[in-house]
Amino acid sequence: MSGQRVTILKTEYVTLDVKRFVLTKPKGFRFIPGQGCMVSIDRDGSRDEQRAFTFTNLPSARTLELIVKIYPEHKGVTQQMALLRKGDALLLHEVFGTITYKGPGFFFAGGAGITPFLAIFRQLHKEGRLKGNTLVYSNKSAGDVIMEEELTAMLARNFLKTFTRQGVIGFRDRRIDKDTLITLVQDFDQHFYLCGPPEFVGDLQRMLVELGASPESLVFEA
């Protein structure tokens, strides 16, 4: 299957099971922060097996960046991507995505669901427009937090972490529930950005609407 061929310039692990890829950028390639792309590995037998990944770099950058959660138990594309290194190639297919910035609000990310928000925050930070935005980032444990130092530097006190399986002193150690939302959100008449596992997103949609948020204010991947 056809696609734009890009070469891997650098790889590194940012957590135990999350790998960062820096890629060449095709001339004229465009995306909006928060959008992603269907990606396949440029190898015989792998080119037709596409998976969706989100770009985390600034659109103006000279290279592309993907941050990928590796699922070895799935024995699929991410397991193969774990073995890729500098000089290997990927194919970029259709650009897509409905998670784009609409205005200040709350961002709720679960695990690797942080990736579309990274590009958005980086762009807002560059433009000096991060004020009024809060990130609530849920992970199983402290070791699963992706790009923690950068997020802390950009958002400071507006970066809130929750952990579902590991109690960490000074941080919430439970799943995000209605009580959490009532404590954190004083105004439900604003934008709410949601990204993570389907159950995580679905539960937040339901709870936010029940607490007074307009369905039209919820931004998520349909």
Language-model segments: what does each one mean?
Residues 1-2, 222:
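Absolute protein N-terminus
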Residues 2-86, 139-141, 164:
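Ferredoxin-reductase
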